[in-house]
């Protein structure tokens, strides 16, 4: 471009020509001017070309600049990494890092953030770097950087002031002191070899305000750079200005401080000259000191009182919590923590301790109490969980307090009296235990050291005149009558108010001998036994019953029972086969044995039960039946080959007995034999109905019956209500009316993605912003604890089989929100700004719509839930684990397995938790009432008859 042209002609003509045109900052020759105007009017520009306007007044870096800078930085970083890697892998040993040519100290910020050019995000402290006015800044932050500005000048000033101080104390006038100080300081000229600049020259701008503070190298550098090299005239001016601002600010403060000090020193010197004033001043000082001390002691005492009160409150809270736990697990009187009691008694005397000691002691106690409180809270949580889970196991009136077992020790006098009497008949002996186990052969194994406190009451001596409540057999009357008639008839004594004192004392001793023991009465091993580990119930050895005394069936004894049953059934089966084979021979026997009706069969089985419970011998039930019904089996019992060995006798007698036991109707269905309809109204068939009358415990397809399992109903069928009612499915949970109105073919997936997502998204985003501190660095699983997204139960209770779809979806989107806020917004441990909150809200809503909304391609969560539904329907846990073993077996063996399976199902039904608990509850209630009542009656009778 040539020189700026001077317009030929007058100014008026130029104005007339250029009046309408926009003014140009630079006057151009005509050939350049046209080109510029074309660009300005965006004529014949290339496609990607942009007109570039640069304003020198306020230059702003564009995005391209930043990108270029960023790229450059990345290249340098890469090169540095390469160098460092090469150095690391090289064989030569490393020199000291400072002298190492590859050593690059780490910058303070590890992450490069592209600078934002908006005014809003400017830091409030940016005014420190660039002074906005010529005034000195009001507050100067005390940073390590500001230490760099202290230099020889301020040091000199301080030295001069201290010198003046000394001179004035020694009695010079201020003027003299000043003169002398100036003179002395000008004489002291320190030799300065290193500093090469004049005193007005400030240090270079780089050391003044470094952009990125570098970590200083640990070793001293060999070469010292001359700092003048990089300074320019402008640098010097700016730095001088800054230093003047700093110094003027500091000097003002310093001078004021020094002047006040000098003033007080002058006053002090004057006071020293006149002793009366000095005395007064001293007196005043002492008074002020005394007042100050008094106030300090008072404030300290107030603080001590507050701390002591807080300690007392904490101890009180702790005691309350411990009392609550104690009441839940025990009925013993509560005695608090003895250490806390001692502390409460002695804590008021701590006021006398010096403050530091007091502080240490109370802090220790606070820590200790906090620790105890934490332990107590954990303990309480465990107890509460235990009680919440054991609702069904609680005894009387289903209160949450553990029930109380009655233990009755009969008085010593009664024992002496009854021991002299004759032993009771064997039929009465059964009252010694509270519950008889169903089968005498199965000895229970003890699986755990935990015991329960049902006391075995041996009341056989006391109950001679009464029937026991837990008897299963009608009492044999004759021997009892004989004994009663043998006793001398005592005249009945009436109880009256005028009874002698001895009677009352007897009553007292009798009542004292009834002691209550707080023990849980559960007869079933709990599913949540781990929660009980830290709760110890008070018990001693003699008060507890071993596991074998309870009616519960652990796995070992269940196996043994099933083995016994299968053995027994095998025998029955063999007998049936042999009987069919010998039908022709046994016709004569059938004539001898009367045809047994159903009634007689039931009485037989009753007798069998009686005999089993009465005799604890190891005889088999068949032998016992034979010995009971001697007349029935007399024909077969006189066998010529009979030997003296018992087991051989049993073998000979078995064929006839089996004929008696098996009922012809029952032979068809073996399962009926094991269901006890008297004990539990619910029969086995009813219990298994939901599985579609399929009795087998597996799906192996050749065992009991292979009727296909009913189709699982799902909410994804999308059938209209008419078609749905026509389809053959399980009974739907929702009634038909509700189905047509509320639930007309609603697809849960569609509902979640369309309606529910719209409603819940803003709520979730707000929650994430509110709880940002708790959500920082949290994964999706823990995020459910910070805020629980709504579950299906909260929203609607009617269709409870849809909850998996709904719940998994709400958890999914909440997790997505948490992940997003953690990934992009919660950085560096600071709170989000308003702008960031707005940005996050928009981004999160958009993300939820695109990724989880109706048009999103991702619906894996749905297929997952469907899959788990399917698996649940298949019941893979119930597939029989012996299936593979059994595949290659012959039919007879398969039949054997089928029998075993029947037994297993029956045992499971018979010894189900629920049944056992109900049974134990009933027995407990009746036993408690009847036994207590009878014992009291017999004791009162005995006491009265003695008198």
From Swiss-Prot:
Report the protein's function: Recruits rsa-1 and, thereby, phosphatase let-92/paa-1 complex to the centrosomes. Recruits sys-1/beta-catenin to mitotic centrosomes during the first embryonic cell divisions.
State the coiled-coil residue ranges.
276-320, 563-591
Any idea where this protein resides? Cytoplasm, Cytoskeleton, Microtubule organizing center, Centrosome
Specify residue ranges for compositional bias: Polar residues. Answer: 90-102, 179-188, 430-449
Quote the biased-composition stretches of kind Low complexity, using this chain's numbering: 411-422
Query: Lineage, please?
Result: Eukaryota, Metazoa, Ecdysozoa, Nematoda, Chromadorea
Which biological processes are named by the entry's GO terms?
A: embryonic digestive tract development; mitotic spindle organization; protein localization to organelle
Sequence ranges of Acidic residues compositional bias = 580-590
What protein name applies here?
Answer: Regulator of spindle assembly protein 2
Chain residue ranges for the region called Disordered? 20-148, 173-211, 407-453, 575-594, 600-662, 681-705
Cytoplasm listed as a keyword? yes
Q: What happens when the gene is disrupted?
A: RNAi-mediated knockdown causes defects in spindle assembly characterized by kinetochore microtubule instability, a reduction in centrosomal microtubules and a decrease in outgrowth of microtubule plus ends from centrosomes. Also causes a reduction of sys-1/beta-catenin enrichment at centrosomes throughout early embryonic cleavages. Increases sys-1 nuclear accumulation without affecting sys-1 asymmetric distribution in E and MS blastomers.
Ranges of compositional bias, category Basic and acidic residues: 30-50, 62-84, 645-657
